[in-house]
Amino acid sequence: MGAKVEKSCVLRTTFLVKVCKHENYSQLLYVPLHAMKKYCFTLLAVLVAVTVQAQKNHNMEVAKNLDIFNQVYKNLDLLYVDTLNPGEVVGTGIKAMLRSLDPYTEYYPESETKNLKMMLTGKYAGIGALIHYHQKQKRVVIDEPYEGMPAAEVGLRKGDIVLSIDDSTMTDKDVSYVSSHLRGDAGSKFVLKILRPSTGKKMDFKITRRNIKLPELPYYGMLEGNIGYINLNQFTEGCSKDVRRAFVDLKKQGATALVFDLRSNGGGSEMEAVDIVNLWVDKEQTIVENRGKISQANHAYKTRLEPVDTQMPLVVLVNGETASASEITSGALQDLDRAIILGTRTYGKGLVQIPLDMPYNTNLKLTTSKYYIPSGRCIQAINYKRNGTGGYRERVADSLTHVFYTAAGREVRDGGGITPDVEVKNDTIPNIAYYLSASAQDSTEVMFDWVVDYLNRHPAIAPAREFHLSVEDFEDFKQKVVKSGFTYDPVSKKQLEELKKTAKAEGYYEQAKDAFDLLESRLKHDVATDVDKHSEILRQMLELDIITAYYYQAGGIEAGLQYDKQLKEAIRILQSPEEYKKLLRPKKTA
């Protein structure tokens, strides 16, 4: 038998061989090719039939559920006690459906399509100013006019209270309402009536709306030691050209190293991210690959141009609000060992959306794929897909992430965003600073009002990098805070109150009352003492607000660099060539 088998192996090359294992032995089976072909055709036919049936079942489910939705709405419209607004009811249904998927798949009714366009392009027609709701005045105020925009050109100032737009009163409206009226068609004119707190006078401004492009690159400049610095806010159309111009200009000024700041950059255009990476890596390098359910969603993006500089040392700054296209940029530069990533772990948005035109001038922004950077990893941090236990939207645990390798062999991981090569946490903002700032929901606006008053008393200040508040100025601010009656509850006090409630519910409060009283007395705060305790950060916040009012975003960023702990570490690394090179080499294993 063995000889016959051996002979067959040599002579009958048209036979296929299959190995069958059974218990403790293996048997070689020789199957004629025509029989195997018949088997394959049969298997293929079965697979096709199963696929067709599965698709048929899916289509039936779609039709069934659309019919159910249609019948539900028809009965609501026919029988519900009140008359329904079709657009509102169906729109609510659509948005509820999309909420079950991910936060990036969104429906835009006709009234909101301009918002989508602004998000995609960074452009809108309006006056070019940041506004916010003043908690004390209970009105919308001008917060920050943008440099070179209509608001700044006509003379609007920080603190001006919006009273009316043409004949429409704005005194009892929220930010969204006022913003929608400030925007309009480019070239359209309107009259804005404001109240200027410093004089108590009402003033009319005739304004012509213009196309406003949000400043995606608010500042770039030279730092100590021939190090260039570029700050990018978002990845809108054309931003790669702006970054290229800034980088070339910095090289002309003598930059021999670069800090590229992507902190709090929420992303934007994927192609712009590829073109920015292209500044520092060679042509024809794959930067990102999209993979989706349908073939049209699959695409690999490569660098298209000759680079500007492939050798200059580069540090990219990131934080927890660095997302999407920012993560493509920082992740690709990390995977290609072209830059040191410094800061804190990024947001972790590895999903790609496309805008789709829908009937009746509506739009749908739809997640169609995940993106994968050069090492092959996807950095999506949250799993939005429902699992078998009914849970969803769970952050990928570090223990479930997978190891990938950079071009030089450094270990990196997928899931959970981009982990920096050098982790540096910025100092946290104390509770009192949050409640004093205008961003706090229940802010007394005392900090905002003091800054507005300072601006009115000082028609000019020193250059951005040189300006500092005097001791007398800060003391005046502290007295204003104390006299305003400002108070706040530290987190520790709130947690103590929760602990008291729990102790009472469980019956332990009375026996522990003395301990609670002692702890409460220790946690009491004095506002004046707290202002002194946190004077450094409060002084910085005041100075940056004032500088931004005089020198716009560029001035505020420039002045803030002197306080930037992460930037200082980036500069130190760039000034240490051996440490920089070591960070880009794989770690030696024992």
Which residue ranges define each predicted feature?
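Polar, glycine-rich mid-to-C-terminal structural blocks
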Residues: 325, 337, 342-344, 348-410, ...
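Bacterial Sec-dependent N-terminal signal peptides
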Residues: 1, 5, 9, 13-59
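Short clusters of hydrophobic/aromatic residues that line enzyme substrate/ligand-binding pockets
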Residues: 107, 287, 301, 379, ...
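Cleft-lining beta-strand/loop regions that shape enzyme active-site pockets
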Residues: 53-65, 69-86, 141-145, 149-158, ...
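Extended, small/polar residue-biased N-terminal targeting/export presequences
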Residues: 80-141, 187-209, 214-219, 561-571, ...
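Conserved functional hotspot residues or short segments at active or partner-binding sites
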Residues: 378-590
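A structural signal for short loop-to-beta-strand junctions that line the ligand-binding cleft
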Residues: 127, 306, 365-367
